[in-house]
Each structure stands twice: as C-alpha cells, then as structure tokens.
Amino acid sequence: LHLPRRHRLSCARSHTGNAAEEIVMPVNRQFVLDSRPTGNVSPSNFRLVETPAPAPGAGQALVRHLYLSLDPYMRGRLNDSKSYAKPQEVGAVMGGGTVGEIVASNNPRFKPGDKVVGMGGWQDYALSDGRDLHVIDVTRIPIQAYLGPVGMPGVTAWYGLNKIIAPKAGETIVVSAATGAVGSVVGQLAKIAGAKTVGIAGGAEKCAYARAELGYDSCVDHKSPDFVAELKAALPEGVDGLFENVGGIPFATCMSRLNNFARVAVCGLIASYEGAPTALDNVGTLLITRSKIEGFIVGDHLALWPRALNELAGHIAKKRIRYRETIAEGLEKTPEAFIDMLKGRNFGKQLVKVV
C-alpha cells in the first residue's frame, strides 16, 4: 500500500542467513471507547491508538476510509443500558458509517479502487467480509452524500415521512432539527408531496437557511425566549404530521397542537440524550385527537432501502433535494466533532474527512 509517511510504521523481518529486512506497513489510527460518559460526553471518553493495518484474509477486503459519519444515535450506544442497538464496547473501536476505497481484496465482489459505503467505524482502515459493504457510483453523486441524503439519514427521513406520516397535499408537517441530516430531507420530501412545512431549528442562521434553501414555509428558532408562543403562532391550522428528532419542549408544544388523526413519527430525542428525559404531560391529546404516534428504527426496514435510495438519488441528481455538510478535517478531530454535533454546533450532516 502506498501511503503518506504519516500513515506508516516500520517493523523488522528476519530471514535465516540474511540481515533483518525492513517492511513498511500502513498505520491504522483508531479511536476506541476508553470510558463510558456520565452526563455530557468528553474527549477523555475516547482514546487514540495506532496499530498496523490488517491484511485481508480469505473472502475479505481492506477499506481505506475517506469520510466518517457522525450521528446522534451514537450517543445512546455509549451507555451500558438496554436499547435498540447493542452498547458500544469499552476498549473497542467506535462504530459508525464510512465511505472509502478498496485497497486490497480477496473477495471477488470487490476490486482495488472500488468506492464503497460500509460501517467501518472511527479508524483509517477496516477489514470486511463484504456483508456490510456496497459499491457506490460516485460519477453523479459526491461520495460523502452516501453518508447523508443518499445514506442512512436520507432513508430515515424517507421512511418516517412516507410510511408513518404519509403527508397529503395541503397538510401541515412540522419537523424538529429541521436543518439536520435527517430533518433537512424530511422537509424537502414533504414539500415535494405538496405539504406546508414548518421547521424548528436552533438559531437565526439555521432558520434563514431552512426557509431560503430548504423551502420550509416557516421556521421557528427554539433558542428564542418566546419560542413556545412563536411556535404556536406558526401553527394556526394545527399539526397534521410531526417528524420528531429532538423531544423536550418542542415536542410537547407540537403535541398540544395536533389535529384530528395526526401522525407523529418519533425518530430521535436528542434533547434527552445527555440528561434526564423531559416528561410528556399531554398524552391525552393522542386520545382526544385520535392521533397515531410511532417510534421507528430505520434498520428494521432493510427491504425498503433500495426503493428509498433510488428515489433519493433521483432527487439529488435532479437537485430537488439540497443538503449541507459540516466537515471536520482529520481523523484526530473526530471526538471534538462528535461533541459539537451533540451540542447542535454543526450545520447539516456532520462528517469527518479522514484523508
């Protein structure tokens, strides 16, 4: 493998009767979970280690990562508690979505140079038997988009909107975290369906972007001291569909404005990931309005991924869906970028450019 010097380490190999021979091998930098956070995540919860990049065995391929995906669900996996996903093991490489390039392969499905999307985690290189890898076409769509609007976040948006909310033309759809990787796609798909869209985002800049670039009819700043009153004022006709990514006060306020037979898709509750959850004190609204509320995990619906990805790719190629990225430069910035994302400091999809 031909790599920059900063990605190399040396070791010695001896042969009988010959002098020691130096072999140059690539270094695999890895972030492992060093300790579980109590409260807010800290950089000290992660540890950077360096090991030789592994050689692929029978049926395996070696991937050099180009971009890492950072997503809110990762916070829940840091806790040693029951959830829909297995807790991240202490001492193990942090898991997560990746896009990269095949650099060596003993698997007939992949050849060196192939661009792939997978779940290689927070490291320079990863071995795979191919079950979690998919070759991607980067001629029409940028490679990092396969971690965003044409990846897990995009499919999450597609499923929650189409299969749970099922918007009708003229209905009012509310999206919290409206400019995030998932929310930004939800809002644009809802507009394509003919709905009126109301976004909730953090800060005047994000709300301006939601209206001007993502096409939201209105956007309410959850950092405003008058947020509750402003959100209610933005919903004079009530809420027909709610795509919930945040929880807390925004969720409770929207619940109080549900119309009859409204549909609520609960995708995430990031407001409670690092603290005590906010109690929902108006669940009676669900009965009064005969509304439906459904939590979902997009990984439960793999059979629908090809259809969703095909539709999303078409929208991206025709520029019907716009997206924005925050990219941290260098693997070493991963913990800091992860923490910034949890605090809402990112704009759009949070990525790490590895090389």
Identify the residue ranges that each predicted region occupies.
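NAD(P)H dinucleotide-binding glycine-rich loop of Rossmann-like/cofactor-binding domains
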Residues: M94-E101, K111-A177
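Glycine-rich beta-strand-centered segment in the early N-terminal region that forms part
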Residues: P52-L70, L78-W122
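C-terminal hydrophobic helical "lid"/dimerization subdomain
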Residues: P26, L302-V355
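Short, Lys/Arg-enriched N-terminal segments with co-localized hydrophobic residues
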Residues: H2-V24
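Mid-domain Rossmann-like dinucleotide-binding core that forms the NAD(H)/NADP(H) cofactor-binding site
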Residues: L147-P225
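Short, glycine/polar-rich helix-capping loops at beta-to-alpha or helix-loop-helix junctions
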Residues: Q123-D124, G202-A210, F227, P277-V283
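Glycine-rich phosphate-binding loop and adjacent beta-alpha segment
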Residues: I249-I321, V354-V355
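Short amphipathic alpha-helix with an adjacent loop that forms part of the alpha/beta core around
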Residues: F227-P236
